[in-house]
């Protein structure tokens, strides 16, 4: 059975996190709780972050698992965490929108590409950071599904 890559339940608005670790764990836990990945995927998200930061600029980070994490992915999916106050991702990089990604097979590349296109428009990012409802974020990222 196919699941939507992004659904309302994958979005957390007005999150308050203490640090990057807590933010990544939350992004992964949403994917676990909604049936996209196994628990072990979260460890692989931390491994990826240790290799290289997933901070992308424009207040966005896109944490995802390492190449060998695919075995823990049940369905492709993304989680969105809005952090209006921001969280430090190191080197002075502040993240206000965290997009956790899990891709089955090589689907993560297509998902990343679509997200990159949407997020290259600063207005889209600002709208998602200020969004009052999950629907506002869904409407901007609807082409990811």
Swiss-Prot record:
Q: What is its main location?
A: cytoplasm
- Catalytic residues, per the record, are 64
UniProt modified residues of type Phosphohistidine? 64
Provide the protein's localization.
Cytoplasm
Q: An example Gene Ontology cellular component term from the record?
A: plasma membrane
Q: Which GO terms describe its molecular function?
A: kinase activity; protein-phosphocysteine-sugar phosphotransferase activity
The record's keywords, sorted A to Z, are: Cytoplasm, Kinase, Phosphoprotein, Phosphotransferase system, Sugar transport, Transferase, Transport
The record places domain PTS EIIA type-2 at 4-144
What biological-process GO terms show up in the record?
A: phosphoenolpyruvate-dependent sugar phosphotransferase system
- Per its UniProt record, what InterPro entries does this chain match? PTrfase/Anion_transptr (IPR016152), PTS_EIIA_type-2_dom (IPR002178), Sugar_PTS (IPR050893)
The organism's place on the tree of life at top rank? Bacteria
Q: What is known of its domains?
A: The PTS EIIA type-2 domain is phosphorylated by phospho-HPr on a histidyl residue. Then, it transfers the phosphoryl group to the PTS EIIB type-2 domain.
What's the stated role of this polypeptide? The phosphoenolpyruvate-dependent sugar phosphotransferase system (sugar PTS), a major carbohydrate active transport system, catalyzes the phosphorylation of incoming sugar substrates concomitantly with their translocation across the cell membrane. The enzyme II CmtAB PTS system is involved in D-mannitol transport.
What is this protein identified as?
Mannitol-specific phosphotransferase enzyme IIA component
User: What is the organism of origin for this protein?
Assistant: Geobacillus stearothermophilus (Bacillus stearothermophilus)
> What is the name of the gene encoding this protein?
mtlF
